[in-house]
């Protein structure tokens, strides 16, 4: 356990950020799972809306540094490909 005031604060902030990042990562995974579920249900309008939400969530996560921008780009590419394959 740190004794210096600034070190105590850093530990506290690290805990808070860990919780926030875990929550955001979980929300991102949930959004992607909702897209997969919408795609599986064969409801095109619902899947299109879910795709838009998933792409937006990936972009936001990359902008905030939650995931790497290349990871976001790769995931967007893959889900868009799956959507186009299912719709066409």
UniProtKB/Swiss-Prot annotation:
SUPFAM superfamilies: Ribosomal protein S20. The keyword S-adenosyl-L-methionine does not apply. NCBIfam families: S20. The keyword Ribonucleoprotein applies. Belongs to the bacterial ribosomal protein bS20 family. The gene is rpsT. This is Small ribosomal subunit protein bS20. HAMAP family: Ribosomal_bS20 (MF_00500). Coiled coil: none annotated. PANTHER family: 30S RIBOSOMAL PROTEIN S20, SMALL RIBOSOMAL SUBUNIT PROTEIN BS20C. One of its GO terms (cellular component) is small ribosomal subunit. GO terms for biological process: translation. InterPro entries: Ribosomal_bS20, Ribosomal_bS20_sf.
């Amino acid at each position: 356990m740190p004794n210096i005031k600034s070190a105590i604060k850093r530990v506290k902030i690290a805990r808070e950020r860990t919780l926030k990042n875990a929550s955001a990562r979980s929300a991102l995974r949930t959004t992607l799972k909702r897209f997969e579920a919408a795609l599986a249900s064969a409801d095109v309008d619902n899947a299109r809306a879910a795709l838009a939400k998933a792409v937006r969530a990936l972009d936001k996560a990359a902008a905030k540094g939650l995931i790497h921008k290349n990871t976001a780009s790769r995931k967007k590419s893959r889900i868009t490909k799956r959507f186009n394959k299912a719709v066409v």
